C-alpha cells in the first residue's frame, strides 16, 4: 500500500472513531473505498459530501463543548491534581495547564522605549482629521502595553480596553463627566497637543478610530496595488476625435525621460551576415504554431482593447479610421489573388511568382545577401 493510500486509510479511521461510528454505518464511507484499491478517481455527490461535513462539524462542536466544560471545571476548582481529568481525556492534551500555586515573576517593561510610539499613535487617533501618520499593528499593541503599565493612565486605558470587546457598528461607550476630565488629562500628558482643543469630540473621534483599527480584518494575502492606466487626468469631458487624443498622448510620451538606452552595436546576432537564422525561426514557428489563429486572436484582442479604451477615455471610435491600420492585409490578399508571395527578412522584401507551395518540413530558401527591394523575379 502506497503512502497516499495509507494516509487515506488512517484519516478515515480517525474520522469514524471521532464521530462514534466504529461500524461505519454512514453511507459516505464506502464512497472512498475504491481509492484504497487501483482506482484514482471517485464520483461523490454534493449531497453526500455535505452530509459528511455536517456530521463532522456536529461531532467537533460536541467535542469542544465537552472538553471546554472539563477545562472550565478544572480552572474554577483550582485543581492541582488532574489524575481524574486525565483518565477521562485519554490521549488528549489539556487546553489549559494546571494552575500552580507559585506566583509567576513578571518581567518589568521598559517604558521609555514605548513612549515615542504611544505618543505618535495616540496623537494620530485624537487628531486624525488634522494630521496623518503611518502606523502598523505593532504600534497599537505598544500603545496598550504602555498605558497598561502606568498607573496614571488607568482612566484612559480602561476606556480603550472597552474598545477591545466592542464591535465596529456598536455605539461609542458613554463617558461620565468625572471620567472625561481624567481621560482628557491623560491625553494632554500623552500627546502634548497644543494646536487644537481636546474635548469630548476628540475623545469620541479617538474611540471611533480605535474601533475601526481593531475591527479591521487582516488580509490573508498581501494587497497588490496596480496603477490604473485610465485616470482622471486622461479622460475627456466631451467626446473628442481620435487624432486629438493621439496627439495628447504623444505629447505625454515626449515629456517623459528615457530610463535606459540600448545600443544596436551590442546585438550579438548578426542577421545581415547570416539571414538563414531568421528563415529557420520563421519556418519553425509556422510548423509548430497555428499562425492564422494567432493573428486572429491578436487582432481581436487589439480591437476589444481599443473599443474599451475609447469608451473609458471618451474618445470617438471611428471604424473606418481604425481599419486603416490593417490595410496591409488588403495588399496580402491582393498578392494571393495574383499568385505572388512576399518574403521579408532583414528589412528587405523580395517577391517571386508562386508555382508550388514548399512543405513546412523543407528548410526555407536561403536569401541572397545582396537583394533589390521590390524586385519581381519570375521563374
Swiss-Prot record:
**InterPro entries named in the record:** AcMNPV_C42
Q: Per its UniProt entry, which superkingdom is the organism in? A: Viruses
Q: What is this protein called?
A: Uncharacterized protein in P7.3 3'region
- Organism of origin is Cryptophlebia leucotreta granulosis virus (ClGV)
Give the lineage. Answer: Viruses, Viruses incertae sedis, Naldaviricetes, Lefavirales, Baculoviridae
Amino acid at each position: 500500500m502506497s503512502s497516499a493510500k495509507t494516509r487515506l486509510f488512517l484519516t478515515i479511521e480517525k474520522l469514524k472513531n471521532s464521530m462514534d461510528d466504529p461500524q461505519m454505518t454512514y453511507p459516505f464511507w464506502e464512497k472512498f473505498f475504491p481509492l484504497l484499491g487501483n482506482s484514482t478517481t471517485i464520483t461523490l455527490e454534493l449531497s453526500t459530501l455535505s452530509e459528511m461535513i455536517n456530521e463532522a462539524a456536529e461531532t467537533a462542536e460536541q467535542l469542544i463543548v465537552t472538553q471546554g466544560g472539563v477545562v472550565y471545571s478544572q480552572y474554577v476548582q483550582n485543581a492541582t491534581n488532574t489524575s481524574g481529568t486525565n483518565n477521562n481525556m485519554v490521549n488528549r492534551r489539556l487546553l489549559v495547564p494546571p494552575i500552580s500555586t507559585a506566583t509567576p515573576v513578571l518581567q518589568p517593561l521598559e517604558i521609555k522605549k514605548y513612549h515615542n510610539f504611544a505618543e505618535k499613535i495616540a496623537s494620530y487617533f485624537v487628531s486624525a482629521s488634522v494630521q496623518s501618520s503611518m502606523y502598523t499593528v505593532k504600534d497599537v499593541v505598544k500603545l496598550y502595553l504602555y498605558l497598561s503599565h502606568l498607573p496614571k493612565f488607568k482612566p484612559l486605558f480602561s476606556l480603550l480596553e472597552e474598545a477591545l470587546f466592542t464591535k465596529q457598528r456598536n455605539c461609542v461607550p458613554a463617558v461620565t463627566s468625572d471620567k472625561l476630565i481624567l481621560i482628557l488629562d491623560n491625553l494632554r500628558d500623552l500627546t502634548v497637543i497644543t494646536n487644537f482643543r481636546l474635548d469630548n469630540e476628540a475623545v469620541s473621534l479617538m474611540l471611533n478610530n480605535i474601533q475601526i483599527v481593531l475591527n479591521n480584518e487582516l488580509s490573508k494575502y498581501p494587497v497588490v496595488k496596480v496603477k490604473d492606466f485610465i485616470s482622471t487626468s486622461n479622460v475627456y469631458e466631451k467626446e473628442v476625435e481620435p487624432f486629438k487624443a493621439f496627439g495628447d498622448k504623444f505629447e505625454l510620451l515626449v515629456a517623459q525621460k528615457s530610463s535606459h538606452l540600448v545600443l544596436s552595436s551590442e546585438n550579438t546576432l548578426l542577421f545581415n551576415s547570416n539571414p538563414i537564422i531568421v528563415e529557420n525561426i520563421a519556418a519553425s514557428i509556422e510548423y509548430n504554431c497555428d499562425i492564422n489563429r494567432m493573428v486572429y486572436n491578436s487582432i481581436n484582442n487589439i480591437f476589444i482593447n481599443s473599443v474599451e479604451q475609447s469608451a473609458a477615455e471618451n474618445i470617438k471610435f471611428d471604424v473606418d479610421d481604425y481599419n486603416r491600420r490593417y490595410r496591409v492585409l488588403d495588399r496580402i490578399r491582393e498578392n494571393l489573388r495574383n499568385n505572388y508571395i512576399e518574403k521579408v527578412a532583414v528589412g528587405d522584401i523580395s517577391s517571386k511568382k508562386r508555382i508550388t507551395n514548399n512543405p513546412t518540413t523543407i528548410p526555407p530558401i536561403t536569401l541572397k545577401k545582396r537583394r533589390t527591394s521590390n524586385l519581381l523575379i519570375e521563374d
